[in-house]
Amino acid sequence: MPRVVIGMSGGVDSAVSAFLLKKRGFDVIGLHMINWDVQEEGTSHCPRSKDESDARNVCDRLNIPFHTVNFVKEYWNDVFLKFLENYKNGRTTVPDIDCNQSIKFDVFHKIAREKFNADFIATGHYATTNFGDFQQNAKDSDEIRLFSGKDPLKDQTFFLCTVNQEQLKRAMFPLGSLQKSEVKRIAEEQGFQEVAKKPESMGICFIGKKKRFSDFLDEYIEPKPGRILLKNGSEIGNHHGIHQFTIGKRINGKYLEARSHLGFFVSHIHSDTGDIIACEGSHHPDLYASRFLINHPKWIRTFDPFNRISSNNFLCRIQRTHPPIPCVAEKQEQFLSVIPRLALRATAPGQMCVFYNTKNECLGGGEIMNIQETL
């Protein structure tokens, strides 16, 4: 049977994935990735030693080999520095997407292949492909296509939108056809109560329990004071750095001289001047984008879908927790101009816009460069 190296996070999803692989007869090896230096982390919701211990215990229970691999340097250089640079320039970013592309489906697979002679890697993502959750339908002559997992609330294709053909063809997603409730039930039936009861990791794990997001960024980004202005140019406050703000976020009253019962929200960030543009009310028209530009989108299949499919058949999403909505996309040289059917709130440069077709196939995505217009 093929050898599969599975990424063991110490959580319930990777535990059940490993069990399902072993049940199907694969030669399974568990590999725990260390991506963050605990000296940087401090006290955390996801302490490395606990996760590593839980992952090891699951592998011991399944009687499969367990190893660890250190990707701290790669994660710092390929994911974290980009994350900081984006926030330093007032852009919103999704580090999980970069982590999947550069770490989990790149250097992780190289280690799996070169050190452990693996045929495939596996992860606990809620996603599936036309090749099947276990590559059982794979054909060398076919292109692999990425589809949403069975559980719409847990679907993680959003975070896999930049993974390419080669990377997907060597990957398995054992949970693609399962609901989260089924995964937890299997975990409890197999005696994995410890991981089944663990809280799900939410947000960016390296920030740590004791820190607020803005405090964490302050540790790495030098403060650069600026003004908070209304659209008409009136100054209503001052701030210590644009990295503490994102489009759509309510502005803390400590930064403001003006007051409003509706509250003031970030509608634009000028990285060149350091000015924050504010608007009044959480549903102000300036917080909604009806058109935005995507730069150099990456497609999962080997062709540009906009050359073959009517743009009216596309859906897009800019946040994983929001369902895809219909959109029209127009090619403008290396850019795509995207017009969602409904204006989207808090659309920010740096965010990823991920495209789907009407068959729940994830086509790819690209970074939002700028907002062309609002309602």
From Swiss-Prot:
The record marks H125, R250, Q351 as: Interaction with tRNA. Residues 154-156, 319-320 are annotated as: Interaction with tRNA. One of its GO terms (biological process) is tRNA wobble position uridine thiolation. The active site is at C99 (nucleophile), C205 (cysteine persulfide intermediate). Residues 94-96 are annotated as: Interaction with target base in tRNA. GO terms for cellular component: mitochondrion. It catalyses: 5-taurinomethyluridine(34) in tRNA + S-sulfanyl-L-cysteinyl-[protein] + AH2 + ATP = 5-taurinomethyl-2-thiouridine(34) in tRNA + L-cysteinyl-[protein] + A + AMP + diphosphate + H(+). This is Probable mitochondrial tRNA-specific 2-thiouridylase 1. It comes from Caenorhabditis elegans. The lineage of its organism: Eukaryota, Metazoa, Ecdysozoa, Nematoda, Chromadorea.
